Amino acid sequence: MFHLRTCAAKSVHKSWDIFFRNTNAGAPPGTAYQSPLSLSRLGFYGLHESDLDKSTRFEEFLQRGRLNVLANVIRYHLGMYHRRSSPYPTDVARICEEAFTRRQILLPFRKPLIVFTPKSLLRHPEARTSFDEMLPGTHFQRVYYDLTRAKPVWYAGRKTHLTELQRFLDTAFDLDAFKK
């Protein structure tokens, strides 16, 4: 599982207050909705521009330990209500799902929403969303996490799992491929 470093709650409280003061003083209306993480405020979150470049990988981002302030703000102010905001969408429809964009707008606080997804994953046939799922009368499927039964999992980032799944399906009934 992911282990996030912690620091003193007092410094987190001070940093969070500074963030709100700066946002209220300098951000034009609606900016928080359009771009929750501006490049000018990356330093506050412990992030650097290199963390958000085109080749950033989700695993490397978590290993760098840049989310320590965010994790402490969650623990200190919200009582584990909102765990993290670094989603990894599995298809195009999930980017606009309640767990991503809608939740970000409806929450009473602002926190960076960092979305990792490769372009090739969004173009993959298995990741496509049909228009039938977006018609009037449909709704988003909710996902509830039962953290009391959390277990360590293996994580395959980027398009690795789709590539491996396709390789498995191509060779599932071809016994000669397994003899090699």
UniProtKB/Swiss-Prot annotation:
The modification N6-succinyllysine is found at residue 14. It catalyses: N(6)-[(R)-lipoyl]-L-lysyl-[protein] + 2-oxoglutarate + H(+) = N(6)-[(R)-S(8)-succinyldihydrolipoyl]-L-lysyl-[protein] + CO2. GO terms for molecular function: oxoglutarate dehydrogenase (succinyl-transferring) activity; thiamine pyrophosphate binding. Its cofactor is thiamine diphosphate; Mg(2+). Thiamine diphosphate binds at residue 64. 2-oxoglutarate dehydrogenase (E1) component of the 2-oxoglutarate dehydrogenase complex (OGDHC), which mediates the decarboxylation of alpha-ketoglutarate. The 2-oxoglutarate dehydrogenase complex catalyzes the overall conversion of 2-oxoglutarate to succinyl-CoA and CO(2). The 2-oxoglutarate dehydrogenase complex is mainly active in the mitochondrion. A fraction of the 2-oxoglutarate dehydrogenase complex also localizes in the nucleus and is required for lysine succinylation of histones: associates with KAT2A on chromatin and provides succinyl-CoA to histone succinyltransferase KAT2A. GO terms for biological process: 2-oxoglutarate metabolic process; glycolytic process; succinyl-CoA metabolic process; tricarboxylic acid cycle. Keywords: Glycolysis, Magnesium, Mitochondrion, Nucleus, Oxidoreductase, Phosphoprotein, Thiamine pyrophosphate. Gene3D superfamilies: 3.40.50.12470. The modification Phosphoserine is found at residue 40. Its EC number is 1.2.4.2. It is found in: Mitochondrion matrix; Nucleus. GO terms for cellular component: mitochondrial matrix; mitochondrion; nucleus; oxoglutarate dehydrogenase complex. Belongs to the alpha-ketoglutarate dehydrogenase family. Calcium ions and ADP stimulate, whereas ATP and NADH reduce catalytic activity. It comes from the Eukaryota. InterPro entries: 2oxoglutarate_DH_E1. This is 2-oxoglutarate dehydrogenase, mitochondrial. It comes from Mesocricetus auratus. Homodimer. The 2-oxoglutarate dehydrogenase complex is composed of OGDH (2-oxoglutarate dehydrogenase; E1), DLST (dihydrolipoamide succinyltransferase; E2) and DLD (dihydrolipoamide dehydrogenase; E3). It contains multiple copies of the three enzymatic components (E1, E2 and E3). In the nucleus, the 2-oxoglutarate dehydrogenase complex associates with KAT2A. Interacts with ABHD11; this interaction maintains the functional lipoylation of the 2-oxoglutarate dehydrogenase complex.
